Amino acid sequence: MYKKYDKILNKGFQLSDFVETGIEVTEKLDGSNASFTYDADAKKVRVFSRNQELTENNSLNGFYQYVQEFVKDFNDLQIATLSDYTIFGEWLTKHTVTYKDEAYNKFYAFDVFNKKSGYYVSHRLRLEVFSTLQLKTPEEFMTFEPDELLILNKEKILSGIKECVGKSNLTLIPNTGEGIVIKSLGVRDPDNNPSYKLVTDRFRETKGLKQQKPTGLQVHLVDYAITEARMKKIIFKKLDEQVLTEEDLSLQNFGKVMGSVAKDFQDDIIEEEMDEIIKQIRKRIGKQLPNLLRPFLEEKDREMGDL
């Protein structure tokens, strides 16, 4: 029943990967990943944070109660729809971005998972489900059908996408949002059709490798991925999950906070940055190997010489 939302990748987007499906570009909201569905066997709505099922006492800042109130007057069609799908979205509570007061404590649906097929549904069906359930959604900035991706100028498409990063009508100061999400218009296999995010510098979870001043290989590789943005992301998750409280965020509680976030911080880097880390290791090896090989071969030349 529980389905954890698949990671949105922060690198590797290639427009050519979507020429058969098309793409959509939507606002990425700075809230808590959450979901809900209807369990027909148990005859109840089940509500989840990113990592666990929620209850009255573990509610993700009121999301559990919000959903129960939201669905209490659902008709038969809406219940049947919710039985087939898990609805994913963002529960908007205060994190880093400052939104208008009226935007908070609302759920913005951004994806629909078909529980029978194990796939995320198409853009068209997703909008139908959202309409049936009367759900709010993040702003959709643009869509490109497959034929448009083939016909339109690639650089203009990419330029238009980049211009959307940070746009928001919900932020207190206009257009100071977190970023955008790019995903396929078609049915999506969680294992083979990832979504991508582009965020503003404020939310970038890595530092440019060229900006680093490494004192050694390990420091260089670790430092590029250890950022305040990534740390804040993990801390906010722990607050949402009630592992930490606002009162815990004090220097006198350093040990508790460190113990709560360290493993998730490490796992997040390993999951999101492993490809880049391996790439940098290979690059480093490629640079250092000649320094070993050259003197070795020079020595062999001397051994074979007459003098």
Residue ranges and their predicted role:
Residues 1-307:
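Core nucleotide-handling region used for phosphoryl-transfer chemistry
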